[in-house]
């Protein structure tokens, strides 16, 4: 409900429909309410069913007890609660009417009237399931609904009456037959109850089995997931191992190719490359000798002598040859020969040049001793291969090499009292003899 004040002397009060919330204009009859009208509006609904005289006395004797009816067939107890009755006209729902107020009490009279009207609607709402007030349209709708419910109730009442008439018209035989059918139905009910109990037991057993099966299925799912993870891990390891295997196979093929290539490669020829560069004999691109027009550095000459000593030392070891009188000591560009008769005597196969070079004859003695070792190598080869012959004959006592296939001249391997041209040519012939010895050893010991 809502109210609004339009002036200081008048008040327009409007009520709202409790369904559609539309403002209402009350009928003028609400302004004049006597005691009888209020009692009719606020009186509760009374039971319309007539009560037998005997029952009336019983109810009057026990007004505080509630009627109790028990049906014999279904054993269901039903209780009827009558509606509340108006015990006195001076109950809590009564109103005290106020007479007409004077003009000075208009506002007070209007407030009281408003309170009475509001209380009246509250009482009406409490007596029924419908909230009041209602507008005309909502009232018509409510009446239509009540008419529908009334029709349904009347139809049900007619059906009950027909059933009651049929029951009253039934004979005793029909009743006995019905009782027999009832007993049969009761037996059938007991049988069905037993079957239901059996089914319930089976259901419990099946439920327990289902729970066990579900637990087993869950365990199997977990095992399957674990096996799947392990399978994935093994698959990953397999792929990695396959990659490693392919890599190793590729390495093996490459290593086999290199091995085949190395088997076909002569180690001595690959390690010691003897050739010539103009008038110089070279070993591994180091020139051995020097000319006035081409003053080769002594470091290069010493390195060439170191490679030459290493070559002869390797050939001797391959053949198992032990040199007499001297022992070769490969030591890079400071290689030397060690005298077997005098351990303290070392013959250096390197030189630094200068004035000392012309007066120091150890370098010459070392070259002659090396030529002696080459001669011993030649003699050792000739023991097993009589047809073996070096292109240049060597005279160890004189320290010379003869050009037997050419001019027939002899060239000293010493530097003292010798020209650089002849010394360089003698060294070139010596390298040529070593190349022939290298070729023979390679042919004899290639597969050994």
Swiss-Prot record:
It is found in: Cytoplasm; Golgi apparatus, trans-Golgi network membrane; Endosome membrane; Endoplasmic reticulum membrane. Keywords: Acetylation, Antiviral defense, Apoptosis, Autophagy, Cell cycle, Cell division, Coiled coil, Cytoplasm, Cytoplasmic vesicle, Endoplasmic reticulum, Endosome, Golgi apparatus, Host-virus interaction, Isopeptide bond, Membrane, Mitochondrion, Nucleus, Phosphoprotein, Ubl conjugation. Residues 243-448 are annotated as: Evolutionary conserved domain (ECD). There is a cross-link at residues 400, 435 (Glycyl lysine isopeptide (Lys-Gly) (interchain with G-Cter in ubiquitin)). GO terms for biological process: apoptotic process; autophagosome assembly; autophagy; cell division; cellular response to glucose starvation; cellular response to nitrogen starvation; defense response to virus; early endosome to late endosome transport. Residues 110-157 are annotated as: Interaction with BCL2 and BCL2L1. The modification Phosphothreonine is found at residue 117. The modification N-acetylmethionine is found at residue 1. Pfam families: APG6, APG6_N, BH3. Residues 423-448 are annotated as: Required for membrane-association. A homodimeric form is proposed to exist; this metastable form readily transits to ATG14- or UVRAG-containing complexes with BECN1:UVRAG being more stable than BECN1:ATG14. Component of the PI3K (PI3KC3/PI3K-III/class III phosphatidylinositol 3-kinase) complex the core of which is composed of the catalytic subunit PIK3C3, the regulatory subunit PIK3R4 and BECN1 associating with additional regulatory/auxiliary subunits to form alternative complex forms. (Microbial infection) Interacts with African swine fever virus (ASFV) apoptosis regulator Bcl-2 homolog; this interaction allows the virus to inhibit BECN1, and thus autophagy. Plays a central role in autophagy. Acts as a core subunit of the PI3K complex that mediates formation of phosphatidylinositol 3-phosphate; different complex forms are believed to play a role in multiple membrane trafficking pathways: PI3KC3-C1 is involved in initiation of autophagosomes and PI3KC3-C2 in maturation of autophagosomes and endocytosis. Involved in regulation of degradative endocytic trafficking and required for the abscission step in cytokinesis, probably in the context of PI3KC3-C2. Essential for the formation of PI3KC3-C2 but not PI3KC3-C1 PI3K complex forms. Beclin-1-C 35 kDa localized to mitochondria can promote apoptosis; it induces the mitochondrial translocation of BAX and the release of proapoptotic factors. This is Beclin-1. It comes from Sus scrofa (Pig).
């Amino acid at each position: 409900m809502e109210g609004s004040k339009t002036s200081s002397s008048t008040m327009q009060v409007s009520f709202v429909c409790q369904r559609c919330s539309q403002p209402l204009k009350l009928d003028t009859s609400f302004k004049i309410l006597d005691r009888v009208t209020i009692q009719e509006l606020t009186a509760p609904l009374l039971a319309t069913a007539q009560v037998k005289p005997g029952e009336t006395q019983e109810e009057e004797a026990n007004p505080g007890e509630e009627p109790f009816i028990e049906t014999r067939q279904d054993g269901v107890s039903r209780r009827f609660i009558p509606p509340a009755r108006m015990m006195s006209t001076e109950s809590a729902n009564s109103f005290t009417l106020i007479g007409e107020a004077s003009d000075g009490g208009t506002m007070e009279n209007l407030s009281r009237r408003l309170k009475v009207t509001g209380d009246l609607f509250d009482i009406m709402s409490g007596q029924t399931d419908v909230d009041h007030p209602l507008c005309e349209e909502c009232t018509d709708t409510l009446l239509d609904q009540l008419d529908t419910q009334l029709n349904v109730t009347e139809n049900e009442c007619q059906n009950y009456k027909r059933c009651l008439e049929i029951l009253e018209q039934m004979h005793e035989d029909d009743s006995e037959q019905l009782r027999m059918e009832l007993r049969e139905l009761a037996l059938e009910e007991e049988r069905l109850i037993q079957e239901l109990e059996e089914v319930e037991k089976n259901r419990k057993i099946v439920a327990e089995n289902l729970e066990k099966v579900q637990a087993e299925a869950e365990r199997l799912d977990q095992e399957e997931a674990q096996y799947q993870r392990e399978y994935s891990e093994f698959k990953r390891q397999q792929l990695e191992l396959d990659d490693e295997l392919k890599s190793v196979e590729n390495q093996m093929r490459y290593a086999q190719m290199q091995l085949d290539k190395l088997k076909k490669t002569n180690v001595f020829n690959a390690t010691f490359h003897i050739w010539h560069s103009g008038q110089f004999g070279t070993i591994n691109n180091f020139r051995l000798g020097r000319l006035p027009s081409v003053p080769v550095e002594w470091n290069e000459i010493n390195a060439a002598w170191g490679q030459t000593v290493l070559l002869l030392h390797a050939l001797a070891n391959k053949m198992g040859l032990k040199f007499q009188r001297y022992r070769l000591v490969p030591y890079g560009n400071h290689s030397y020969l060690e005298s077997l008769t005098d351990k303290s005597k070392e013959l250096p196969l390197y030189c630094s040049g200068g004035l000392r070079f012309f007066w120091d004859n150890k370098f010459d003695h070392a070259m002659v001793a090396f030529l002696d070792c080459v001669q011993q190598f030649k003699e050792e080869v000739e023991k097993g291969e009589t047809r073996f012959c070096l292109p240049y004959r060597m005279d160890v006592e004189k320290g010379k090499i003869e050009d037997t296939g050419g001019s027939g001249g002899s060239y000293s391997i010493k530097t003292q009292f010798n020209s650089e041209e002849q010394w360089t040519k003698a060294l070139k012939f010596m390298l040529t003899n070593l190349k022939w010895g290298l070729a023979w050893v390679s042919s004899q010991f290639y597969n050994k």
